[in-house]
């Protein structure tokens, strides 16, 4: 079987001994040789959507800042519970924003709502649907582990921990993460002003001119809408400069 002969007119053929630079190597060259040409500014996190961090953001507080209940139920000290597993319910409750001020003694329980700060003496919460209350007590029938249905301090983020790194493009969920970590301002790169245009007498504009028909030898300008959208996605100020003809004087 004869070997397949390479085409002499292959547009991708390179001179013998010459090779394409792999994409990852090309990107490394760009990153090591290019520098930022824009300034930086400090903005409120609430205004940070699509902005690019010019400095890493570190947590200024734990998130959550205190141990809290993940469910509505009854809080008690599993680590100190007696074998009878009979828990007397104290009057009152712990709610989000309204903590219960007193410590919970051994073999007692307190009503807790989702998000409530766990009172002193509480290390476990049982779902309210899993208990049958009789007068002012209940029997714990489920075999809960210590810490069940609770969220410990710093479960999401620990104080001084890196939250988001240099160059991160801020998303909506990132704004919530930063805020919960006590970060209310961030340093970002100044937004770029970018002009985008296409060149070529063969191009037909479709932006603002839908259903425009093609003449022989022409094609729709498809790259410009794509590039404009990419820059908008990255939060930059975009100026659509349309299509420039193949004429150096007009260009």
Regions found by a protein language model. Give the residues of each.
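Catalytic cores of alpha/beta
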Residues: 251
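Short beta->alpha junction loops
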Residues: 240-248
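Short, glycine/charged-enriched hinge/interface segments at domain edges or termini
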Residues: 2-18, 74-240
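Short, low-complexity N-terminal leaders and the immediately following helix N-cap/first helix
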Residues: 1-83
């Amino acid at each position: 079987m004869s070997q397949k002969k390479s085409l002499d007119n292959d547009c991708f053929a390179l001179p013998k001994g010459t090779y394409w630079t792999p994409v990852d190597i090309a990107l490394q060259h760009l990153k090591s040789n290019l520098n930022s040409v824009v300034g930086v500014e400090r903005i409120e996190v609430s205004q940070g959507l699509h902005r690019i961090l010019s400095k890493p953001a570190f947590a200024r507080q734990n998130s959550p800042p205190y141990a809290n209940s993940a469910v509505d139920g009854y809080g008690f000290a599993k680590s100190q519970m007696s074998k009878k597993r009979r828990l007397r319910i104290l009057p009152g409750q712990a709610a989000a924003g309204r903590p219960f001020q007193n410590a919970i003694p051994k073999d007692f329980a307190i009503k807790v709502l989702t998000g409530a700060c766990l009172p002193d003496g509480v290390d476990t919460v049982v779902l309210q649907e899993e208990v049958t209350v009789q007068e002012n007590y209940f029997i714990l029938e489920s075999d809960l582990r210590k810490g069940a249905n609770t969220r410990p301090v710093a479960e999401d983020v620990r104080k001084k921990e890196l939250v988001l790194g240099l160059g991160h493009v801020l998303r909506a969920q990132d704004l919530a993460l930063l805020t919960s970590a006590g970060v209310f301002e961030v340093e970002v790169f100044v937004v770029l002003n970018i002009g985008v245009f296409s060149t070529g007498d063969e191009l037909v504009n479709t932006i603002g001119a839908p259903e425009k028909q093609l003449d022989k030898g022409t094609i729709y300008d498809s790259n410009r809408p794509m590039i404009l959208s990419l820059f908008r996605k990255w939060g930059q100020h975009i100026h659509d400069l349309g299509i420039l003809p193949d004429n150096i004087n007009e260009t």
